[in-house]
Each structure stands twice: as structure tokens, then as C-alpha cells.
From Swiss-Prot:
The keyword Oxidoreductase does not apply. It comes from Danio rerio. Signal peptide: none annotated. This is Major facilitator superfamily domain-containing protein 6-B. It is found in: Membrane. Residues 597-606, 652-668 have a biased composition (Polar residues).
Length: 747
């Protein structure tokens, strides 16, 4: 499954923008919708169990990855997955909530007491009476407590009115406030009244009735099972969307897969814009829900259907963009051939499938007549190895931490008196840091390598978790929110690029599905679910502290394993170098043609012998793309050493050139001996080569015999002598002039 060359990066950016915008817009608001549908009856249910359904069900992504790779139906699976996102998740937003009713809570103290006081006509002294003096006559209460229960009211007195009734009052008085009230003493007044009766009625309520809103439990259970069924089916069929998009994006990038972050950043940008705009829109909406009964204070309900409407529109746009993708199944074979030529794609698979002696130059394979098929057992052999298995474990652990922070960070900050404004600022900083991290991820990977990016992510996680665990003021968490980009965005980009370079193109969708299932599915699901259990038993701060220590231990173990793997590779390379057959003698043989060939090939062997291990690693054509690159300071130091070696080599070449000129002048024969120089030269050549190496004596009879019939001029032999000694081995450059000078004197 590969996009054709007509594809443009704008299509990938648009699809990632709409797709990830909708997914991350729907995920946080799903819990709010479940609460509004009646899940308040089950406290904390959305916080602990909802992430499990949304994350663990992402483990279906490997299954759909296998289907897309096996049947070469990548585009069909992608379109069907996006369509399932639209159908199933939009349906959740239109589920009607359960019926609500308002009921009262039984009061814990005495019900209202009505007291009626009748006065008879006549002139007499009337004293103000209080409810507490009669209601609590046995046993008598002290004066301060009585003062708290005396009503503060005025009596309307009129001599011309037949009946005067005091206003009916309901008052709630707390006994603990008795000491703060002013004590009132009974007052006596003389009021002349006619033959009438006055009725005084007062009602005192010790506590106002409390009313709560309850949901119909049967309807809540029905809605819960319905939403659960929709989530399970929808997530199972919609899980491979992100996996296939990531795979197609990586295959479009080709050898520039490190630039995946530049494409992925558009998804984070869309997420931030959508959460900000839709959140403000929902906050400004108010809806009224019918509640049976009276007495309840109507809560302020928000219209969360807006989020699902926006989700449906934007996901439909993503579906339209996905139809513009062109998948070419035949491109698998050409991609494999291209990867073999550049020797950077699948080193592990090539070493295990092909023999070490075969090469593409010796046996070229036509992709149309003899394509290579990689079974799934090769994929499992790769990912189950120590090198890639540890990387996948780190991906799961980072997903575990991200799921825990995503679920319980704001909970912990709320316990520290954090406000919603703080939560908004934290979200903005997190999105900005992710955008920046995705934008520079390829530069960071080129600078330090994939494995060291994982080191940095684990170290930042350790510092972030430990810092949060010791917080006393919620606002000082803001500096650590900047690390969100390094702990999530950079690690995710490095894992995708690293694993993509390790598997053949035909299995990349399956590999990306496994990575997504471990990081986004199982990792974040376990972080949300197990995090809730740990928070209940130990508390939020202690759980953050324990997670920070676990991150530190993971960093140490992972770095130790990678170091041991590097040592084993060096030992294997040394053993292979020892087993390479070396010529018995690199000394040139006494023939003109062989002298010329050896003279041209000797500088290469000399330069190779002077190369350091760092230079060999940099110039190794079999070096995979995922191997950790050298540090910048090592490269600078190596460049300085190279410059120094070049300067020293030029000086040595000048000295050797002067020595060769002097040797030519001293070893040149006199002109009078030209007639008889052919025979002595033929006899002297074996003597010269006999002293040049232990293996050259075996070639003396063979090489000197064909040379004798050829009457070559002395000038040609003299011209070849400097070529033979142009690059002599160490230890052989000085004896040669002495041998050539003493040879004529022996005759």
C-alpha cells in the first residue's frame, strides 16, 4: 500500500488536520456526554472506565493492519474506518438522557411548629412571648441559647383594628451562632384594647428541605448498555484510520521519514483550534431540561450536541479528502528494490532472509518477475527481538504516563486549588510545545538519533512527574507543561520513524498498527485505569512520585540494554573483519601490467588502513537509517583530526617525492651500457624482487621468463621503477636503493 507520486503533501496535511482534530475533540467530551446522559448515578465512572474503552479498543488496529497488508486493500479500509467514525460517534451525541425527577430529602430535625396566641379584650398588661419558652419548657434552656431562637420581628399594633395578625415567617437559625446574637429581654407594655381578639401565628423551621435530582435507574442502565455497544463496535471498525494515514505518510516521505513531525504537527494544530473554539461555543450555550417535581434548583446544562455536529462535519471533510488518495499496490516491489540499493531500509530482514554472500549486483532481480514476499513471521521476529522489543516497551510506558497525566493531572491541580483558567493555560502550553516538537523533530533525530530521543523523553518524564508530586501551589506547574512536546510528540515521531525503517514496506501498516495499539491503545488505557486504582490507594501526589521513579528505572535499564547491544555489534564486526581473507603479500609482482594495477590500488588500501572506527561507521554503506548518529562535538573533533592527517600526509608525500628523485638519479645506468643493458636488467630484476617480500620469490621464474624475449629500451624500465616504489610498504623503502646500487658491483 503506497501512494503514487502524484500525491502531494497537502493532502496528508489536510487529512491529518481533520482526522486528528475530530478524534481528539470527541475523546475529552465523551465523558461529559456520558455524565449528562445519566452517569452521575455512578460517580467517577467516566474518569476510570471510559479511557479503557477508548484506548484498549485501539488494539484492533494491528488486526486491520494485517488485513490491509494481506489483501492490499488499504484505501478501502481507510474509507470504511473514517465512515465508521462519522456514523457511530455522531450517534452517541443524539442519545436522549434519562428521565429526571425532583425528590426531597427527609429532614433530620423537627418539622415546623405553629403557635397561636389568643388575647382577650380589656385593659391589661401584655407581654411578648416567644416560641422557645413554650416549646422547650422541659428542660429549660439557658438565656444565650434562647436568644438565638427569639424571632426578630415587629408587631403591628392598632387600637382601631379588630384583628391583627403577625406576618408568617420561616426562619432557619443555627445553634452555633447563638453567641453572636444580641440577647433580648422580655418587654412589658400596657395597651388599651377593645373587646376584640388578636391571633398571632408564627412558624419556625429548624432546617429547609433539601431537594435533589435523580435519574430513572432503568433508563440509565439501558442508555449505558446502548452507548457501550456503540463504542465497542465503532472503535473496533474505526481504529485503523490513524494507522493507515501514518503508514501512507511515511511511505510518501520515503527516505525523509524523519520529517514525519512536520506532517503530524497539523493534527495537533487542528486539535488546539477545535478545543478552544468549540469549548468557548459550548460554554456560551444553555439548555433547559424537563424535570418532574418542584423545589429543585435547575442546573446549568450545556449543549454538548454542538461538539458532535462539528465532529460530523469535519470528519465528513476528512472522508472527502481520503477519497483523493491513490494507492498503488505494485509500488511495494519497487520500494523494496530502492531500499535494497540504498542499504538503509531493512537490515535485519535482509540478513536473515538472504545469504551474506549474495548481492544485488551479482544477481539482479526484476520486481515484476521475481518479487520478494515477507511473511508475518519476519515481522514478529523483528519486533520480538531485544532491540525493537525494548523500544516497543518504552513506547508502551510513555503511553502509560501520558494516559495518567491526561486523566489525573487536572484532578491533582484541582486538589491544590487550581482554577479553570489554569487548566486552559496548561492546555495551551501543551499544544504549543507539541507543535514546536513536531516541527523540529526531524532535526533533533538527525542530531542525536532515534534512541537518544527516547532517552531525552524518559528523562523529561522523570523530571516532570517528580516536580508535579512535590507541588504546593498549582500555578507553578506551568514551566513543566512545556516538556509535553518532548515527552509525547518527539517520542512518538522517533518511534514511528525508527520502526518504519526496521520493517519491509509490505509490513509497515501492520507494524504501525502494533505501535499504535501499544502506545495509544494499551498504554494510555492502562495509564487511565490503573492510575485511578493507584490514586485511590496512595493519593495523586504519591502516584506521580512513584511514576517518576519508575520512569528513571526504565531509563537506566533501557540505556544499559542499548549499550550492551552496541558492544555485541562491535564484537561481531571485529570477528567478521578477522575472517575476511587478506592477500598474502600486497607487494607488486614483477610485470609491467601488474605493477600498474597494484600502484593504482595501493593508495586505497593505505587510506583504508588509516581510517578510524568513527570514519568507518560514517562511510559504511550497510549502515541502517535508524543507527544512532555521532554527536556534533565528535564530528568536529574528527574533522580536526582529518585536517591534521591531511597536512601530515602532504608533508610525507613531498619528502617521498624528493627521495624518489634522488633514487632515480643514482640508479640511472650510463649511456654506454645501453647495448648490453638488456641481459643484466633481466638478471637483476629477480634479485631486486627477491628482497622485496617473502611471497615474491615464488613468482620470479614465471615473471622473468616472458620478459627476457622482449627487448625493451632501458628508458621504459627506468620509467617503471619509480612506479614500483611509489607506494612501498613500511620497512621496504630504504633497502631498495642499496640493493640496486650494489647489484652491478657483484658482476
Amino acid at each position: 500500500m503506497l501512494c503514487s507520486n502524484r500525491q502531494s503533501s497537502l493532502d496528508f496535511q489536510d487529512l491529518l488536520f481533520f482526522l486528528l482534530l475530530c478524534i481528539w475533540l470527541f475523546t475529552p467530551l465523551a465523558s461529559c456526554v456520558l455524565q449528562a446522559a445519566g452517569n452521575d448515578t455512578y460517580p467517577k465512572w467516566p474518569t476510570r472506565w471510559d479511557p479503557l474503552f477508548y484506548r484498549v479498543l485501539q488494539c484492533s488496529a494491528p488486526f486491520w493492519g494485517f488485513v490491509a497488508d494481506r489483501f492490499k486493500k488499504g484505501k478501502a479500509v481507510l474509507l470504511f474506518s473514517v465512515l465508521c467514525w462519522v456514523v457511530f460517534n455522531c450517534g452517541i451525541g443524539f442519545v436522549k438522557p434519562a428521565a429526571m425527577s425532583c425528590v426531597s430529602v427527609d429532614p433530620t430535625v423537627q418539622s415546623p411548629v405553629n403557635f397561636t396566641n389568643y388575647t382577650h379584650a380589656g385593659n391589661h398588661t401584655r407581654q411578648r412571648r416567644y416560641l422557645t419558652e413554650d416549646a422547650y419548657a422541659n428542660p429549660p434552656l439557658s438565656q444565650p441559647i434562647l436568644a438565638a431562637y427569639r424571632p426578630h420581628s415587629r408587631y403591628i399594633r392598632s387600637a382601631n383594628t379588630n384583628t391583627t395578625s403577625a406576618p408568617f415567617r420561616n426562619s432557619t437559625v443555627d445553634i452555633s451562632m447563638a453567641s453572636n446574637l444580641t440577647t433580648m429581654s422580655p418587654s412589658a407594655t400596657k395597651v388599651p384594647l377593645k373587646s376584640t381578639s388578636t391571633m398571632e401565628t408564627q412558624a419556625i423551621t429548624a432546617k429547609v428541605k433539601q431537594y435533589i435530582i435523580i435519574f430513572n435507574k432503568e433508563q440509565v442502565d439501558t442508555i449505558f448498555l446502548l452507548i457501550l455497544l456503540v463504542i465497542i463496535i465503532g472503535e473496533f471498525f474505526s481504529a485503523p484510520a490513524v494507522t493507515i494515514v501514518d503508514t501512507v505518510t511515511l511511505q510518501y516521505l520515503g527516505q525523509n521519514r524523519d520529517r514525519y513531525g512536520l506532517q503530524r504537527m497539523w493534527g495537533s494544530l487542528g486539535w488546539g483550534i477545535a478545543m478552544l473554539s468549540v469549548g468557548i461555543w459550548i460554554d456560551n450555550t444553555h439548555i433547559t431540561i424537563f424535570i418532574q417535581g418542584l423545589g429543585c434548583v435547575l442546573p446549568d446544562y450545556k449543549n454538548y450536541q454542538i461538539a458532535f455536529i462539528v465532529f460530523g462535519v469535519l470528519m465528513t471533510s476528512a472522508l472527502i479528502v481520503a477519497t483523493q488518495f491513490h494507492f498503488d499496490n505494485r509500488a511495494y516491489q519497487s520500494d523494496e528494490e530502492e531500499d535494497k540499493k540504498e542499504d538503509v531500509e531493512i537490515p535485519q530482514v535482509i540478513q536473515e532472509v538472504s545469504s551474506p554472500e549474495s548481492s544485488s549486483d551479482d544477481a539482479p532481480v526484476c520486481p515484476e518477475t521475481n518479487p520478494q514476499h515477507f511473511p508475518f513471521k519476519d515481522l514478529f521476529r523483528i519486533i520480538c527481538g531485544v532491540r525493537y522489543g525494548t523500544v516497543l516497551f518504552v513506547a508502551w510506558f510513555m503511553g502509560f504516563g501520558y494516559g495518567f497525566v491526561f486523566t489525573f493531572l487536572f484532578w491533582h491541580l484541582e486538589d491544590l486549588k487550581g482554577t479553570t483558567t489554569l487548566f486552559g493555560i496548561c492546555s495551551v502550553l501543551s499544544h504549543i510545545s507539541e507543535l514546536a516538537a513536531y516541527f523540529i523533530s526531524h532535526k533533533l533525530i538527525e542530531l542525536v538519533g532515534h534512541i537518544r530521543v527516547l532517552y531525552i523523553g524518559l528523562a523529561c518524564n522523570t523530571a516532570r512527574y517528580l516536580y508535579i508530586s512535590y507541588l504546593e501551589n498549582a500555578w507553578i506547574v506551568l514551566p513543566m507543561e512545556v516538556l509535553q512536546g518532548l515527552t509525547h510528540a518527539s517520542v512518538w515521531a522517533a518511534c514511528i520513524s525508527y520502526l518504519s525503517a526496521a520493517v519491509p514496506p509490505a509490513l509497515r501498516t501492520s507494524a504501525q498498527g502494533i505501535l499504535q495499539g501499544l502506545h495509544l491503545g494499551l498504554g494510555r488505557g492502562c495509564g487511565a485505569m490503573l492510575g485511578g486504582v493507584f490514586v485511590n490507594f496512595f493519593g495523586a501526589a504519591e502516584t506521580f512520585r512513584g511514576l517518576g521513579m519508575a520512569s528513571l528505572v526504565t531509563l537506566l535499564i533501557f540505556s544499559l540494554i542499548q549499550w550492551l547491544l552496541g558492544q555485541n555489534e562491535e564484537k561481531k564486526g571485529a570477528m567478521l573483519a578477522e575472517n575476511i581473507p587478506v592477500p598474502s603479500s600486497p607487494v607488486p609482482i614483477a610485470t609491467i601490467d601488474l605493477v600498474q594495477n597494484q600502484s593504482t590500488s595501493q593508495p586505497n588500501s593505505d587510506s583504508k588502513s588509516r581510517k578510524t572506527r568513527h570514519q568507518e561507521e560514517q562511510e559504511d554503506p550497510n549502515k541502517p537509517a535508524w543507527v544512532v548518529s555521532a554527536s556534533p562535538w565528535v564530528t568536529i573533533a574528527f574533522a580536526l583530526y582529518q585536517i591534521r592527517d591531511m597536512v601530515a600526509q602532504t608533508k610525507n608525500n613531498d619528502c617521498q617525492g624528493q627521495q624518489e628523485r634522488s633514487e632515480q638519479q643514482t640508479s640511472a645506468a650510463p649511456p654506454g651500457d645501453e647495448s648490453t643493458s638488456s641481459q643484466p636488467n633481466a638478471s637483476s630484476s629477480p634479485v631486486e624482487y627477491a628482497f622485496q617480500g617473502p611471497a615474491s620469490s615464488a613468482f620470479v621464474p614465471q615473471n622473468t621468463h616472458p620478459v627476457r624475449p622482449v627487448a625493451e629500451p632501458p628508458s621504459s624500465t627506468e620509467a617503471k621503477e619509480p612506479v614500483e616504489n611509489s607506494t612501498p610498504l613500511p620497512g621496504h623503502s630504504k633497502p631498495l636503493p642499496a640493493i640496486t646500487q650494489t647489484q652491478p658491483t657483484t658482476h
